[in-house]
């Protein structure tokens, strides 16, 4: 760990927030028979963020926060175009990344977090491929995101573009948090 916040171990308790937000999503999806929705980047990242905060693992806090932040515009677009807004999603997409940013700024992050962020992204893509149906296209693990489908010749080019964009975003975010 590169630093500690003056409040010390009390900050670990803030890890309860993202875990609570994940639990609310479980409550939302599981009874409706939509448990696969829990595998989305944002939902898994909330759970992992909470655990990372408990452990005060600044690199893991950064990685999950980066995924939550980069997904924010996509979530806003989906809500605006497709509807389906749920109040719990504000907690996931706004409160958790704000908490993560605050902690990253105060704890610091390692220099390898951009590449680790890509590794996490790939792990969540693989989880979606193994645990969910191609029809759901969770984490766009099976097909190009429909609104941009015409911009990419195939899924693999799209996936590489996503990873490149995420890497650049993680580099810029890391520098901004210094």
Regions found by a protein language model. Give the residues of each.
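A contiguous pocket-lining binding segment that forms or flanks enzyme active sites
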Residues: 82-125
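Aromatic-anchored segments of alpha-helical transmembrane domains
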Residues: 18-27, 68-79, 119-130
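Long, hydrophobic N-terminal alpha-helical segment
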Residues: 18-66
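Membrane-interface helix caps and helix-loop-helix hairpins in membrane proteins
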Residues: 27-35, 78-87, 106-107
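Membrane-interface transmembrane-helix boundary segments in multi-pass integral membrane proteins
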Residues: 114, 134-171
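N-terminal membrane topogenic signal
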Residues: 1-17
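Membrane-helix exit/interface motif
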Residues: 52-55, 59, 72-82, 102
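Hydrophobic cores of alpha-helical transmembrane segments in multi-pass inner/ER membrane proteins
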Residues: 44-54, 94-106, 157-175
């Amino acid at each position: 760990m590169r630093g500690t916040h003056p409040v010390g171990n009390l900050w670990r308790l803030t890890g309860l927030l993202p875990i609570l937000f994940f639990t609310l999503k479980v409550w939302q999806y599981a009874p409706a028979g939509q448990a696969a929705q829990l595998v989305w980047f944002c939902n898994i990242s909330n759970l992992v963020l909470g655990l990372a905060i408990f452990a005060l693992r600044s690199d893991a806090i950064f990685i999950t926060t980066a995924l939550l932040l980069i997904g924010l515009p996509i979530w806003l677009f989906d809500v605006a175009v497709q509807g389906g807004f749920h109040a719990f999603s504000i907690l996931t997409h706004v409160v958790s990344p704000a908490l993560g940013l605050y902690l990253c700024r105060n704890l610091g992050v390692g220099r390898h977090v951009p590449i680790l962020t890509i590794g996490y992204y790939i792990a969540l893509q693989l989880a979606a491929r193994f645990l969910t149906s191609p029809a759901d296209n969770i984490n766009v693990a099976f097909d190009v995101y429909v609104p941009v489908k015409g911009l990419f010749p195939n899924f693999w080019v799209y996936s590489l573009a996503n990873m490149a964009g995420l890497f650049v975003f993680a580099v810029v975010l890391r520098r901004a948090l210094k």
